[in-house]
Amino acid sequence: MSELVALRGASFAYEDGPTVLDGLDFEVREGRALALLGRNGSGKTTLMRLLSGGLRPRSGELRVEGRPVSYDRKGLTRLRTTVQLVVQDPDDQLFAASVSQDVSFGPLNLGLSDAEVRARVDEALAALDIAALADRPTHLLSYGQRKRTAIAGAVAMRPRVLILDEPTAGLDPDGQERLLATLDSLRASGTTVVMATHDVDLALRWADDAALLTPSGAHTGPAAAALARTDLLRQAGLRLPWGVAAARLLRAQGLLDASAPGPRSPEELNALTAAPATASGPADS
């Protein structure tokens, strides 16, 4: 998979504050679902804002498809049609009177024709399953609907990379499942998705890769391997995912081969634990 967006040697400090990121190398690879994890204050939000152009590194550089980003109007426009960030609180992002007006804001600022803007808005509303809310005032939306509207505004820009800050936070289980299904659909249509989360179980289940932000830097690898690194999890202030713990127990009991992948969801765990009984045939009656 090719590198879409990358930070090279990037450092950043807020005014009159400590250095948040120092000499960081970080990349988003095309087609990979990436979970970004770390304790509060580890720099996740800063990293996401650097990747999306909301902040500029004090040193180092941001690259898109191998080319350094220029922070002039043309360069930032190119970046924002490649990378879109959706913040955690939708109320920090929504401002227009209605859902369709809010979703149309980004495309309108690209100077597109009215017909193209309408097409993008309709496409984004359909992707987030909120077409029926197009004319609804944003202040009358539920929290989950506001989340979906904020994501639709980013999707309407047709980015190649969609970065989401804690997108499942505050959603009930049904809302979480619906959102994850939507993200899977976006990935299937070619969008690379990055999700910041504190939920290690969600990261194990959903992500192809996981990046753990620790005081020693960003450590990225296949999710199942990265989230089994107890040393890195400890540095990142995270617990061991239940799926990793379950896999270790199954291997200790001889129920899972050492080279076989562990369960990433309850359904996979049920399948693994049912396999020995199935293999041995039906029980005597």
Language model features: what each stretch is:
Residues 115-133:
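Conserved ABC ATPase "signature" region
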Residues 137-141:
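Conserved ABC ATPase signature
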